[in-house]
Amino acid sequence: MNGGVGAEAATLYPTFGGFAVPRSGEPEMEKHATIDAYIGALPEPLRETAEAARRVVHRRLEGATSAIKWSHPVWSLGTAPVCYLKAASEHVRLGFWRGASIDDPSGRLETSGQVTAHTKLRSVEDVDEELFADWLRQARELTLGG
């Protein structure tokens, strides 16, 4: 027995555009060293959507560093994570570590626990630069204590 590697793993975990899809139905992204590689491995329209969201974060979260952490793109201020992109089979999540505290009159942020929140981006049309800029401004203030 090879521990589920090879043909047996392919039967248990069919692939979907660079993802392995376990029984839970949520794809597991292959490990990528860079954000470019992560986004580049996504199928369309997720690739275009993730790239559009990434451009907004880069423009609107000044001074942030970005890297692959926890197997997906994460933007941090200093050592504190602020936001992330995480691909699923039919959408890309733009999430915020302190997102549950973000004022969101649009109702698009979904809380995921007591602290975090995310929005699901199904297409590039879901990327709203002005709305996301406001969320990123609030996330910066929450992260830096301002």
How would you name each of these model-derived features?
Residues N2-G146:
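Charge-dense, helix-prone N-terminal extensions
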